[in-house]
Design a protein with these regions (language model features):
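Intrinsically disordered, low-complexity terminal tails/loops enriched in metal-binding residues
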Residues: 1-167
């Protein structure tokens, strides 16, 4: 816990050390993510600009926004896990169909049994485990807890911008 507090204070000191009269936040999360990726690409002399696709990253970030803020997630506990019906309309339903199955693969790679079923306006996600402690965790995490699992997101965004990966 102390390390976390120190990390936060260090980050605040770093921001203050840059300049107390200049803003440091970009004003919008997707904008800031794209800005950070572009800065990384510009700093890398090996960036192949003929493959860079910032538009694909932007579309993915819009999908993330749709799934996070607009998707409806109806969660039902099962004896061995959870079943979640994730639905939306229009762009939200499309984003759900792109993102949820991809994340089910990530969950399976983490040792849970995750499956999806396509629905007309979304996806049904079922995540189960034979381990009672994991079942408790699955029920606590719920839909968004599953979506944020793993540390692949930032690397995935950089790969997407480089034209190396898409959902």
């Amino acid at each position: 816990m102390m390390g976390h507090d120190m990390h936060g204070k260090h980050g605040m000191m770093g921001a203050q050390a840059q300049s107390s009269s200049e803003p440091t936040l970009p004003g919008q999360d997707a904008f800031g993510t794209i800005q950070e990726i572009v800065q990384i690409l510009e700093a890398d002399p090996n960036t192949d600009w003929s493959k860079v696709n910032i538009a694909a990253l932007r579309e993915h970030l819009i999908d993330m926004n749709e799934v996070t803020l607009r998707a409806a997630a109806d969660e039902k506990a099962r004896d061995n896990g959870v079943e979640i019906t994730v639905t939306g309309q229009g762009r939200t339903a499309e984003a759900i169909k792109r993102m949820v199955p991809a994340h089910a693969h990530e969950l399976s790679a983490m040792g849970w049994n995750a499956t999806t079923e396509d629905l007309p306006n979304g996806v049904k996600l079922v995540v189960i485990s034979d381990d009672p402690a994991q079942v408790t965790k699955l029920k606590a995490l719920g839909f968004m807890g599953f979506m944020v699992q793993g540390s692949h997101h930032q690397r995935h965004h950089l790969m997407m911008a480089k034209g190396e990966f898409t959902h």
